């Protein structure tokens, strides 16, 4: 097995980012999932060294493996991330497709977020000594909600953070003692972690303190409930940092997940009891195949590829945004101070919101922008950096069916021509219900089944493949939204028609905005010249001699609200 150190490619406007170490098998097998390892706080990727040979022995074959140091640790000690979202985005960039994530402690919490946000490239999740919520949520307690009983008390965590700020060396020594506490192989764990500790207060303290804050910020309870991939969670029964009871409670959040525990193990069971951990992982990998969303992968790739030219080609999309803002928010009044743009693309909708509602840019205002396509998010950030208003926008790379936000985060959400790409519309609307505050609004535009009627009809004269995406009817969208608990306030539909001078012109524009065929049943490979000629002949049946070839769109504008009283939606 060969080892290769790889520096991930960077966008032109930023320096190269994270190192990763890749172990390549001598005889790689196609379509085999790549094992990607993320370490915990206060360590680096070297803590996997003693475990990997035992794991490979249990698996009985070689695997491609990738080991990543978090920013500020190990080979990436000279890198820092401004915030949690930036860190997650950079990690997602270097994780290969068809990955199985294996994370320990903080690495497990980060792996859970990544799996939740990227079902298109992460097929399985394995966590070791990982709590869904590491620190108790004071706001939850203040609101009278049932807290996660198995999280660390905030006062205890604050004492640790303050101790690290005042005396990092002494605090790290204490941390190693906590990780080995209760383990039957306590001396082995202590010696291993001490020998691998590499810390410089001068250069790394700020980055390590930032990483500590991630333990406070991450709340994976919703992510675990929504996770579509198979998952295994391993706990030590004597863990002094993450009680084994957290695993039993996690089973209540996600009944299909595997939860295992190891007697006489503490916080680092892969170090003290490697054979037991390896056996559990081997059993899981053999019985649980990766579950990747190929559709979401195609969506992310299509829109990322279209990002640079999108604004020059998206004439319908801009028109629909203008109509959506006018229809749903044009009557005046306050839209709230914390808003979400779901499927933000290159940010045109945000531009319109900032123009029409300047109060959003006040110090207490905040816009969150989420998209699954990294290229779109990069382009949007670049635009708003140039405009000088990026300070008021939080950018999130993620999946709209598993929103990375706590309950009741937003006063409102706007989403233009995004909902039609949902793989599970009920899950999407349920997530939106969860993320909205009581009384919050959700304004959306989406496409109906008559969209691209002429193109679909022309293709039917040529072959049986699904060349045009399928979209839900207005009644179906309304039914799913109400099933999720949202109330329909207003809606309208329109059928704009765009004209093209040729079929090539139409197809290039669809591809240029990323909206070419995503559905299953499409034809793979390139289209032959004879097939394309038959399509052109069929499409000529709709030719308007004065304006060209028509392309009809069916657009729905829908305004929903979450009831002030949740019982009203029951």
From Swiss-Prot:
Residues 1-29 are annotated as: Disordered. Substrate binds at residues 41, 105-106, 175-179, 267. Residues 1-279 are annotated as: Carboxylesterase. It catalyses: a carboxylic ester + H2O = an alcohol + a carboxylate + H(+); malonyl-[ACP] + S-adenosyl-L-methionine = malonyl-[ACP] methyl ester + S-adenosyl-L-homocysteine. Residues 280-570 are annotated as: Malonyl-ACP O-methyltransferase. One of its GO terms (molecular function) is malonyl-CoA methyltransferase activity. Gene3D superfamilies: alpha/beta hydrolase, Vaccinia Virus protein VP39. Pathway: Cofactor biosynthesis; biotin biosynthesis. In the N-terminal section; belongs to the AB hydrolase superfamily. Carboxylesterase BioH family. Converts the free carboxyl group of a malonyl-thioester to its methyl ester by transfer of a methyl group from S-adenosyl-L-methionine (SAM). It allows to synthesize pimeloyl-ACP via the fatty acid synthetic pathway. The physiological role of BioH is to remove the methyl group introduced by BioC when the pimeloyl moiety is complete. It allows to synthesize pimeloyl-ACP via the fatty acid synthetic pathway through the hydrolysis of the ester bonds of pimeloyl-ACP esters. This is Biotin biosynthesis bifunctional protein BioHC. It comes from Teredinibacter turnerae (strain ATCC 39867 / T7901).
